[in-house]
Each structure stands twice: as structure tokens, then as C-alpha cells.
Regions:
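Active-site glycine-rich loops that stabilize anionic/oxyanionic intermediates
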Residues: 64-69, 212-213
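Short amphipathic alpha-helix adjacent to the substrate-entry channel of hydrolases
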Residues: 73-93, 227
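N-terminal cap/lid segment of alpha/beta-hydrolase-fold proteins
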Residues: 1-53
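C-terminal catalytic histidine-bearing segment of alpha/beta-hydrolase fold enzymes
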Residues: 107, 223-226, 230-272
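Primarily recognizes the serine-hydrolase "nucleophile elbow" in alpha/beta-hydrolase
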Residues: 129-202
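The feature captures the conserved acid-bearing segment of alpha/beta-hydrolase catalytic domains
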Residues: 177-240
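Short beta-strand element of the alpha/beta-hydrolase
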Residues: 56-65
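Alpha/beta-hydrolase active-site loop
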Residues: 106-147, 260-263
Length: 272
């Protein structure tokens, strides 16, 4: 049984007050995974630690991907959170605002990307700043309620996948220091719509993982992030796997990319 979701805002989310979409969760054969769509009221779902370990007293917010049209809620959400909780972290799965659609938003996205790619990209770019604002508010909320969650407000991390990685980057580059995480892990993230040429001073350490055969060509985004963070003198680590495709998350493919979360934990442990 999962914990009850925590709403990020007291009322309607700022900037989308008129949205009336109904959140849905269903299995899509197109992506072969469980997805959540039509999020208009963003929430955090706490996943408390299930054992003591290196993450004791630390929080990690997990942002699933899905092209800003859906959230891969298991492989890039709760499966990640459960793994982190098993080594002591207090994890939170973030449901951020998404493009509003009909009964099967994933099918609508796949069709639009086939027939009108520019329109699909425009839809994503339009909602991305709202999703980023939700990521910022999630960090603020966890810090504000740190005592309640038994976490250190100076040890709040953020892991995001694909579009969720874009959210993670927006949070990492926030102009509000109170909304910036203490460490960040954009996994096969897209940098679309974000100026990463000059990372803000005080940005926390970054962990990157991507597959060289990423079907969306996002390897170059991770390489650019690595180079930009290095040039700025910021701590960064990049794992570029030969195979894994896009969206590997916690899927078992019997490839080295399956172990990305172990490498993340190794990296985190070395932060001290």
C-alpha cells in the first residue's frame, strides 16, 4: 500500500488554473509499461526507507519520464524509489504537470510524433516550464517538512528520467537556491528548452547515465552536460553505456545499463 499523495499546492497549480483533465493510470502496450497521464494537480508520493543504509536521513525526489505526456510510473518511478528506500533514503515520486489529452494520451503522442513532430515538440516545450516549477516546489516542500520526514534539509537529491530529467535540470538550474537540490541525476535527459551553457554557481554534484544507442539521440545531451559542468568546475560523473536504448529505467535487459542505479549509489557514497 502506497502512502497518500501530498499535493504541492494548496489550490490549483499556478499557471494552469483552468485545467480540468482527469488523471489516469493504465498499462500501455505502446510503451510496454504502466503510465500516469493528464496530471493537472501535481503531487509527491512518499516512499519511506525500508532499511538502514547509506541514505539515512537523506531524501531523493524521483521524476519519471514520458515525453511530458505521461509518466512511466513504475520503471522510472516507484521501482527506483523502492530501490533507494531499501538503502535508507526517504524517496518521493513526483507526478508533475503534463500535456492534457484524452483517454489515451500516450497513443495520441505516438500518432502526433508520426504525423506532426513539430506540434508534439511544441506541446512538450509549452508544458515543460510548469513541470519544472513543480519540481522546484517539490524540493521546497521536502525541505520545509524535513523534520516530519526525518530528513536533513541540506541533503535533498533529485533523480529524473528523459522528460523527468529535463525537470531535474530545470530544478538544478533554478534561480531560487531554496529550490535547487543538493545533488542531481538526470538520466537520459533532454536539455531542450534549457540554457545549460553556464550552470549557476552553487549547483550541486551531477550524475549522468545514458545509452549510446538511445533511440531519441539524447546521448549528446548528456555529453554536453558533462562538458558544461566540467568547464564550470562543478562535480560531475557520466556513464555512457554502449547499449540500453532509451527509457531503460529499472528494466532488466541483461546489459551493463541495468546496473546504472548501483553506479549512482557508488557515486553518491563517494560524495561523503
Amino acid at each position: 500500500m502506497r502512502a497518500a499523495p501530498i499535493h504541492l499546492y494548496d489550490g490549483p497549480a499556478p499557471g494552469s488554473e483552468g485545467w480540468t483533465g482527469v488523471e489516469r493510470q493504465y498499462f500501455t502496450e505502446l510503451w510496454d509499461t504502466e503510465v500516469v497521464t493528464n496530471v493537472s494537480a501535481p503531487t509527491l508520493v512518499p516512499v519511506p526507507p525500508t532499511a538502514a543504509g547509506q541514505g539515512d536521513g537523506q531524501a531523493v525526489i524521483v521524476a519519471p519520464g514520458g515525453g511530458f505526456h505521461g509518466l512511466s510510473i513504475d520503471s522510472e518511478g516507484f521501482a527506483v524509489a523502492d530501490r533507494l528506500a531499501a538503502v535508507g533514503f526517504t524517496a518521493f515520486v513526483l507526478k508533475y504537470r503534463l500535456v492534457q489529452g484524452g483517454d489515451d494520451t500516450v497513443a495520441e503522442l505516438v500518432e502526433t510524433m508520426t504525423t506532426d513532430l513539430e506540434r508534439a515538440l511544441d506541446d512538450m516545450i509549452a508544458v515543460a516550464p510548469l513541470a519544472g516549477a513543480d519540481g522546484e516546489e517539490a524540493v521546497r516542500l521536502v525541505r520545509r517538512r524535513a523534520e516530519e520526514f526525518s530528513v536533513d534539509p541540506s541533503k535533498v537529491g533529485f533523480v529524473g528520467f528523459s522528460a523527468g530529467g529535463n525537470v531535474a535540470l530545470r530544478v538544478a538550474c533554478s534561480s531560487d537556491a531554496a529550490a535547487r537540490p543538493d545533488f542531481v541525476a538526470p538520466i537520459y535527459a533532454t536539455t531542450r528548452g534549457i540554457d545549460v551553457r553556464e550552470p549557476p554557481a552553487g549547483t550541486g554534484p551531477m550524475f549522468l547515465a545514458v545509452a549510446t544507442d538511445d533511440s531519441l539521440g539524447l546521448t549528446r545531451d548528456s555529453v554536453e552536460l558533462y562538458q558544461r559542468w566540467r568547464a564550470a568546475g562543478l562535480p560531475v560523473e557520466l556513464h555512457a553505456y554502449a547499449r540500453g536504448g532509451h527509457g531503460f529505467g529499472m528494466r532488466v535487459q541483461h546489459l551493463p545499463s541495468d546496473t546504472w542505479i548501483d553506479r549512482f549509489l557508488d557515486w553518491h557514497a563517494a560524495l561523503g
